Amino acid sequence: TYNVYSDGSKKKVNEYTHNEVDAKNFNAKTSDMLPEAIENMSIYQNEVNDVVKYTNEFRTEAGKEPLKLDETLTKAAMVRAIEMAYSNKFSHERPDGNMCYYIMRDFGQDIYGVGENIASRQRNAKEVSYAWKGSQGHYENMISSSFTRIGIGVIKFYGTYYWVQLFQY
């Protein structure tokens, strides 16, 4: 940004930088993202615990048993959050074209009996949890009696949060 004066001179007063991510060629595998996912489990530990807390409060209100936080599901959810952020593909479909639940194969688990909620832009666990509660399909996943375990993924990338809940029987 410049101040331009009547004599034609100008003075630079601010420099604007624009960061844009080129995600067209994103092709990372789960194994590529796993070290960051594991690190993010520590970085976002409070957010993970808070989403689980809100989810279990909603389940209690609905007369359901609480979900148990599962380490493998959390790793998988963290990878899902990372791949959505880095690929700029906010979808239940993974960047490789497979559906979201196929991530479980990368962790040696069955793809059946898996549910996923995704969200972006909410700034904290309370916001995202209540956004999911306010959406019928997401809320149904949260309170489903079929699910017994949960994993949470979150990443803040260029100022935007990406959130993932993975549920499993």
Each model region followed by its residue ranges:
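N-terminal targeting leaders of exported, membrane, and organelle-targeted proteins
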Residues: 1-89, 145-169
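Short, surface-exposed glycine/acidic/tryptophan-bearing loops
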Residues: 75-126
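Mature extracellular or exoplasmic CAP/SCP-family domains and secreted bioactive peptides
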Residues: 129-131
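Short active-site loop/helix that positions an aromatic residue
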Residues: 139-144
